[in-house]
Amino acid sequence: MYTTGLIGKNINYSESPEIHNNYYKKNNIPFFYKIFNLKQDQIDDFIKNLHKNNIKGFNVTIPYKETILQYLNDIVYPADKIGAVNTVAVQEDKLIGYNTDYIGFIKSLQYYNIQVKNFKCLIIGSGGSAKCIYYALKELNARDICIVSRNPEKARLKFEKKVKILNIKDENKLDRYDLIVNCTPIGGPNLKEQKPIELKEIKKNCVVYDLNYTPKRSKLLKEAKENGAFIINGEKMLIFQAYSAIGLWCLNGIKGGR
């Protein structure tokens, strides 16, 4: 039996174990998935003991999607371009990093039949998830992509020079956007009572996507729904990226895993 899992901080809320273990059982895959709640100073030991603990692969979530890069021997496109990794395959002599969030986000839009070509898009946040969503929207030919961040100067170091980056306090013309994506943990399980931004005036039929999936409908999504938006949480993205990760961990891939 091989071990797989999720590393992050304060992540006991994650639905990943249920998704993965159900899939393993259904497809007779000899894997088990568990949570690894790690502090920053525990990552070194976790990496050193991967083979000892029979770990075949692992996912990475907040706040370590960029931190993990220093431990990898190879980073596969588009993770290398994004500069963030959420899936690691453990081979005999090396660790390989991937970004299956990228795939999961694109597949979730396809699931809801949302075509973002020519959309004006707003990304809330500037961390690893935000970079992933930015490159996915570029791949899908979104017309215009703007980033809002609490620290725009720091954010500018992470994105292409041509990207428009604003202080989140200064962006109040939300009716210009066709798609708004929250890539922060604000509104998620550890910050349920907060919203990353006020949605007082948004375009009718605007798509508001919150990558958080717990609670199912965050305060941001509730407000968006009240204002006529089509709302999406991160559950489908989580599922699609999980299947992609499983495919990478299995030697020859598995049915439905890619």
Swiss-Prot record:
It is an enzyme of class 1 (oxidoreductase). The keyword NADP applies. It holds the Pfam family Shikimate_DH. Shikimate binds at residues 14-16, 61, 86, 101, 213. It catalyses: shikimate + NADP(+) = 3-dehydroshikimate + NADPH + H(+). CDD domains: NAD_bind_Shikimate_DH. Coiled coil: none annotated. InterPro entries: Aminoacid_DH-like_N_sf (IPR046346), NAD(P)-bd_dom_sf (IPR036291), Shikimate_DH (IPR011342), Shikimate_DH-bd_N (IPR013708), Shikimate_DH_fam (IPR022893), Shikm_DH/Glu-tRNA_Rdtase (IPR006151). Its EC number is 1.1.1.25. One of its GO terms (molecular function) is NADP binding. Pathway: Metabolic intermediate biosynthesis; chorismate biosynthesis; chorismate from D-erythrose 4-phosphate and phosphoenolpyruvate: step 4/7. Gene3D superfamilies: Leucine Dehydrogenase, chain A, domain 1, NAD(P)-binding Rossmann-like Domain. Keywords: Amino-acid biosynthesis, Aromatic amino acid biosynthesis, NADP, Oxidoreductase. GO terms for biological process: amino acid biosynthetic process; aromatic amino acid family biosynthetic process; chorismate biosynthetic process; shikimate metabolic process. One of its GO terms (cellular component) is cytosol. Belongs to the shikimate dehydrogenase family. Homodimer. PANTHER family: BIFUNCTIONAL 3-DEHYDROQUINATE DEHYDRATASE_SHIKIMATE DEHYDROGENASE, CHLOROPLASTIC (PTHR21089:SF1), SHIKIMATE DEHYDROGENASE (PTHR21089). This is Shikimate dehydrogenase (NADP(+)).
